[in-house]
Amino acid sequence: MAQKGQLSDDEKFLFVDKNFINSPVAQADWAAKRLVWVPSEKQGFEAASIKEEKGDEVVVELVENGKKVTVGKDDIQKMNPPKFSKVEDMAELTCLNEASVLHNLRERYFSGLIYTYSGLFCVVVNPYKHLPIYSEKIVDMYKGKKRHEMPPHIYAIADTAYRSMLQDREDQSILCTGESGAGKTENTKKVIQYLAVVASSHKGKKDTSITGELEKQLLQANPILEAFGNAKTVKNDNSSRFGKFIRINFDVTGYIVGANIETYLLEKSRAIRQARDERTFHIFYYMIAGAKEKMRSDLLLEGFNNYTFLSNGFVPIPAAQDDEMFQETVEAMAIMGFSEEEQLSILKVVSSVLQLGNIVFKKERNTDQASMPDNTAAQKVCHLMGINVTDFTRSILTPRIKVGRDVVQKAQTKEQADFAVEALAKATYERLFRWILTRVNKALDKTHRQGASFLGILDIAGFEIFEVNSFEQLCINYTNEKLQQLFNHTMFILEQEEYQREGIEWNFIDFGLDLQPCIELIERPNNPPGVLALLDEECWFPKATDKSFVEKLCTEQGSHPKFQKPKQLKDKTEFSIIHYAGKVDYNASAWLTKNMDPLNDNVTSLLNASSDKFVADLWKDVDRIVGLDQMAKMTESSLPSASKTKKGMFRTVGQLYKEQLGKLMTTLRNTTPNFVRCIIPNHEKRSGKLDAFLVLEQLRCNGVLEGIRICRQGFPNRIVFQEFRQRYEILAANAIPKGFMDGKQACILMIKALELDPNLYRIGQSKIFFRTGVLAHLEEERDLKITDVIMAFQAMCRGYLARKAFAKRQQQLTAMKVIQRNCAAYLKLRNWQWWRLFTKVKPLLQVTRQEEEMQAKEDELQKTKERQQKAENELKELEQKHSQLTEEKNLLQEQLQAETELYAEAEEMRVRLAAKKQELEEILHEMEARLEEEEDRGQQLQAERKKMAQQMLDLEEQLEEEEAARQKLQLEKVTAEAKIKKLEDEILVMDDQNNKLSKERKLLEERISDLTTNLAEEEEKAKNLTKLKNKHESMISELEVRLKKEEKSRQELEKLKRKLEGDASDFHEQIADLQAQIAELKMQLAKKEEELQAALARLDDEIAQKNNALKKIRELEGHISDLQEDLDSERAARNKAEKQKRDLGEELEALKTELEDTLDSTATQQELRAKREQEVTVLKKALDEETRSHEAQVQEMRQKHAQAVEELTEQLEQFKRAKANLDKNKQTLEKENADLAGELRVLGQAKQEVEHKKKKLEAQVQELQSKCSDGERARAELNDKVHKLQNEVESVTGMLNEAEGKAIKLAKDVASLSSQLQDTQELLQEETRQKLNVSTKLRQLEEERNSLQDQLDEEMEAKQNLERHISTLNIQLSDSKKKLQDFASTVEALEEGKKRFQKEIENLTQQYEEKAAAYDKLEKTKNRLQQELDDLVVDLDNQRQLVSNLEKKQRKFDQLLAEEKNISSKYADERDRAEAEAREKETKALSLARALEEALEAKEELERTNKMLKAEMEDLVSSKDDVGKNVHELEKSKRALETQMEEMKTQLEELEDELQATEDAKLRLEVNMQALKGQFERDLQARDEQNEEKRRQLQRQLHEYETELEDERKQRALAAAAKKKLEGDLKDLELQADSAIKGREEAIKQLRKLQAQMKDFQRELEDARASRDEIFATAKENEKKAKSLEADLMQLQEDLAAAERARKQADLEKEELAEELASSLSGRNALQDEKRRLEARIAQLEEELEEEQGNMEAMSDRVRKATQQAEQLSNELATERSTAQKNESARQQLERQNKELRSKLHEMEGAVKSKFKSTIAALEAKIAQLEEQVEQEAREKQAATKSLKQKDKKLKEILLQVEDERKMAEQYKEQAEKGNARVKQLKRQLEEAEEESQRINANRRKLQRELDEATESNEAMGREVNALKSKLRRGNETSFVPSRRSGGRRVIENADGSEEETDTRDADFNGTKASE
């Protein structure tokens, strides 16, 4: 990120100081000290340097205080190099661990950098102070920038979401999550602020009257909602006590068109009660502190301490003034459009809520009834709310309630009255809040423009753990659980699922962050029900309490892992839930009340009838059922997306909130989420302090580390092939050959051309995936490439424009010279008399003819005006008729609207009654079900009592059996003690032999613990026998009490049932009445519809007449416009002709004067004129022929071009059709490829499962071997068995050690060894179970005895006729007591043995703990090494990428050098060429200069001769008298001299012209030379500077590359050292593997002896494989058929979708027709045009309808084929089932053979056990392999049958879908037929529109032709005039010679006037001025 010198004050909180980070001193210090992170109790982690390594421990020196500490290797974490300090994206860290992440966040936080990227999301730490990073300047900095171009900021997140919404056309959401006080609300406000600036809807608009109104209101909505919904809590001074989802709608161009706010769960209980040091909602304090005196008197306000509902009085907020905030809130409401009356009404309601708290009730002396001794507060409440005081107090103290069908008054107690007032206050405030929200939404959504997409911002209460957590905290924490689960699912599950779906190489990583168990604990509906479901269930029962709810919750969810019962119970209403952020203790007191939210009906009806309109509006929709108040309408108005389901159902607060949350989660899942994780640094709300453990806990809970890890290891950026090719093909322009190419193949070629590292990307099925930062790098290169291309294009454009401007200047220069010459000629010509005469006479020639034409045109115009007036009168009449018809139509529509509204109200009432009836019926059914359950339970109790008598008879026998069992137990105890002593000795021996027998000790410990637990159980049972009798007696009494209660409840239920039946009959009668009313309304509606149809028919006739009239009017207007155009063209032609007439007249006058002057040369001049006229006519004819041929050629070229265009369009259509076919084929091939890939994956997984099960079976074979060898012996052979187990444990421990050595590379071996170890544990546990069977039987007998004793005691109290039997049992009990006393003595002995065993157990546990600690240490080392390996792999990838980037830069550098060399050589060549041209032009200039000098010399010589001749002529004239005789000769000589002089003049003029031209050329050459020289010098200088700059830049880059290479060498050296270490470990492992291989070879030698017996097994295996292959073949065929059926189904679905689209298009056309009909009332012309267009559309729709009918027939054929194929598949399934049964029989036969082989094997094992133990083990392994193969066959057979069942199911689903599609197609057909009638009406309109457009095009073409002809004729006239002028000039050259001759004397004698005239005429007709 570019830094611009010194950072400004606000940029210091955004940018990092790179000078400190890139310090080489810090880098060297880090490398020298070997810095690491070690755990710290204060700071979480502390920096230290490694001093010494001692095995598994490391001695480190703390950097802060220099203290040396010894820590474990597993506890230290690597430190990143200093260049990664304060890194902006933590995914760039080299060593990713908790310490590095915490350190980076801490460093940035202390530097004022609160935003940090963490992979794909952003982490924000609350600064607890104001930072200058939210100004308009910062907004402009982030506007339109990419993420990597600017530092982290909430503006960057908002801009990314905004740009993604516009580019991808996908809805976006920004989720700010975190604990309470972390800064979610503030960041939400910043997002809205940024969007209001960037996407302002008034940008670029001219209307400034509404500038930014919507944006202002959007920004001001937050202060209003915060004032009424936020409060101060312990953790946060501005805590949102409600959740909100702000949906900002944007149009297609990205402007804001509206917004909507949805709220969730306002904590309304805060309005009446607050915890210590907390406040209620802000508006209460704002109002009391900021209201003026008048307002205080109007609102009846008092001091803070005078209100009971303000529990803590006035609690100030630091840095906030309540009075100022009140003014801001009032201003915000004014901006939102709240009137002053509405504001005052709102504040009155707020004040009334406070006054409700001041109402005090007292208990009367003799009764519990409540009374109100002082009603002052009540009077204030009633004054503010507009209700009667007496009615209000009566409703509170003695409300009227309904008992059955009667209404009675019931006196309330003090507690009930207090509760009613508090409930009223809460409900009033909640309704006020919802009204404000509805009003705000109405203001924000008043534009009524359709939004193309939206951006949602979620701000919801954060996770809360208070001292007392109630129902609101449960809902808030439940919401946060759902949001965190969405984050985990989006970041971890969906990301990896897409990798697998695209088929890229990826191993699925389970991050263990599933929160579903906790969510199900709260929201699960049944089996078992969750917290909310149980709470709703308890709300049904009238006697339910909070304690019963908690008890039921503990019984249902007591075993749930996320549910806990607190150990130290303060109250019986407490329970705990383990959330993702920690354990929360909830107190369920008053939860039932909060969930039901009851209200007093009497008070709500009073408020509904209030005199205050605002209060009445708040309470207008009260609907109460079963004690719950309903606010359905208000909820719908505030939540536009909420559906109108179950208006009258029993709806609890929990249910409503759960549904709202479900809709919110659905909305979020449909958007692309952008996560912002807000972190709270400390709980003291202090800036500059960061609690490390608090931040770490939040990072762990939020999944920050896992998110960074998957961002680093995964491929977070992805792009589809077509978009990648379209966007980045400019970077590899020549890589893709011309012609069609598959998108994937093209991307592969582009990747090769771009030379990307293969580790940086993966190519999937439809997308290409990139690691972090790769796409950003490609974007930068693309921007640079586009910049270069644009610069080159701009240079070419500027060059072209400069050349064009230069040519234009040259043309202007020559034109200026011509104009100057002509102006000078005109100045001399204007005083010529003949010219003046010509200009006066010429305009008078055509005046008479033009006047006649003007008169005719005026007559025609008058007629046209009359016709237009007539048409206008007709149009006015038609408009009057139309207005009458529209009025009639409006009246009919109003009547129809009123009737439909009446019908809708009746329908709504019917629906509401039906819902109430349904609710009551459900309650009745539930009561009946409970009644039946109670009856069943009573019958069960009677049956149990009958069973007791029979069971009592068997009690004596069971007691005797128990005594025998006790004796057996004592014997077993003695034997067990002996065995335990032996085992103790053997354990000591084993400790001496090997110190790694921890596993066996664990097993022995479990065995001993089982024995001790059994002994303890026996002791407890012996003690409890004395208490059994009392217990059973109490149980019987409780059962009798419960039975009586059940009988009472049954009677109550019967009464309720009768009552409900009566209500149901009343409802039936009401429903019948309503149905009769509905029938009457329907009849009236039918009549009105008939009248409306008749009116519409009349309207159609009127419209047709109007259309005809409009058609005539349009024709007349067209005719008028044609005439007007003809008139204009005639006028223009007349003016043009007059102008031409004047010009020709002037020319004619000039010609006449010239002809008069040139009468001397008559014959020759006439001949020349005739010749010239003939030449002119010939030229005219040739010109006409040329124009005609040119027009013909143009016409032919147009026809050819049109034909070529048609051919190309046909070819294009063919190519499109071919492309569509290829796309379909490609899709089918891709589907087949995906299916094959899926099959391959399934087979691979099956193979892995088979291998895994093979290993398990091998372990089971070993287990069977040990069981077969050890199970046959008696328990006396325990010592031998222990020795065997010792050997096995030794082998296992050896394998474990080997696995620990291979921990880095052989993790799978560790898993297999642990599985083997688990098998041995299970084996030992099974043996202990066999030894303890007797004790379990004893426990069973005791349990049976207990149950019988219970039954006995119950019968003693229930029946008196069994007293004798009870006395005998008492005698038996006394005997049993004696026996128990005897047994107590044995128990004491057992206790002594127990103490001894406990000591042994303690020793064993100590040894076990040591072994477990060693194992944990090994696990830690393994994990640490694995993390180091992962870091090394990441470093290696980074280094590879760095090397590849360096190589690419080197290649680019070489390429740039080569280009620079080429450019410099090219410029050198250009310079040489320019110098050569300059030299040539200089030589030409010199030669021209010499020629000019020669011409000047010749001119001077001619002038001298001329002067001499003049002198001679003067002499001759003067001597005329003397030589009169020689006059004739003198005249001849004079004429000769004059001709010579004339020739000399012409030569002189020609020489002067040439001289002028050479001078001009010389000047141009000099100017061009100077310009070229200057440009060349500037280019050379710029090129030198550019080369110098590039050289310096390249030197800097080389220096940077050298430093980077040096770093890379160091890192490579470290990697090489690690590699050497790993290679050493590998060599050790290879040595161990060699020893294992030698042992394996020895086993193989012994195995070869028994290979003959294996051949039989192999044959059977081959048979089984053949049968399996047959099954697979048949299954594949079935799958192919199913795929073909699926393809047919897909085709049918596509056809159906096409029909659906056609239907939707028809609907759209229908709506457009309706709109056009409405618009026809104002403009008839548009309706006529639209009519013709729509008629053509109707024809097209008819054709599409016919095509759809054909498609439907084809679809029915396909359905028939599908049914036939389904029957065929069912037959094949039957055959497959038969083959499967055969395979099953074969498998059973193989299993029997396998059992026989096992028995043979056991026999062989008994025979040769002592000698060939190893060979038997090998045989058993082989047998296990065969068993595994057999089981594999069985599994494959099961998979085949499963796949067949799946195919069956798919086939049925396909048939059902086909049937549904057939029905839908029929519906579409009916809709299309209905649309035909409307569609035919539109066909005529489109034809008329086409005729109109053709006529307009014809007129346009006609005018274009006339214009072309006029311009051609004008050009021809101009050419003719020029030709005449040139002829006239040539004629004057000869005609003026005599005049000069005759005027020669005048030239000599007279003054200079005549000479000037001659010169003027010469200049005029020759074009150049002769001067003497």
Curated annotation (Swiss-Prot):
Residues 85-783 form the Myosin motor domain. Residues 858-882, 1744-1800, 1866-1972 are annotated as: Disordered. The keyword ATP-binding applies. Residues 1789-1800, 1866-1876 have a biased composition (Basic and acidic residues). Transmembrane segments: none annotated. Residues 31-81 form the Myosin N-terminal SH3-like domain. GO terms for cellular component: cytoplasm; cytosol; extracellular exosome; melanosome; muscle myosin complex; myosin filament; myosin II complex. One of its GO terms (molecular function) is calmodulin binding. It is found in: Melanosome. CDD domains: MYSc_Myh11. Residues 661-683, 762-776 are annotated as: Actin-binding. Residues 1762-1788 have a biased composition (Polar residues). The keyword Nucleotide-binding applies. Signal peptide: none annotated. The modification Phosphoserine is found at S8, S23, S40, S1684, S1722, S1954, S1971. GO terms for biological process: actomyosin structure organization; cardiac muscle cell development; elastic fiber assembly; skeletal muscle myosin thick filament assembly; smooth muscle contraction. The rodlike tail sequence is highly repetitive, showing cycles of a 28-residue repeat pattern composed of 4 heptapeptides, characteristic for alpha-helical coiled coils. Limited proteolysis of myosin heavy chain produces 1 light meromyosin (LMM) and 1 heavy meromyosin (HMM). HMM can be further cleaved into 2 globular subfragments (S1) and 1 rod-shaped subfragment (S2). Muscle myosin is a hexameric protein that consists of 2 heavy chain subunits (MHC), 2 alkali light chain subunits (MLC) and 2 regulatory light chain subunits (MLC-2). It is linked to A chromosomal aberration involving MYH11 is found in acute myeloid leukemia of M4EO subtype. Pericentric inversion inv(16)(p13;q22). The inversion produces a fusion protein consisting of the 165 N-terminal residues of CBF-beta (PEPB2) and the tail region of MYH11. This is Myosin-11. It comes from Homo sapiens (Human). The gene is MYH11.
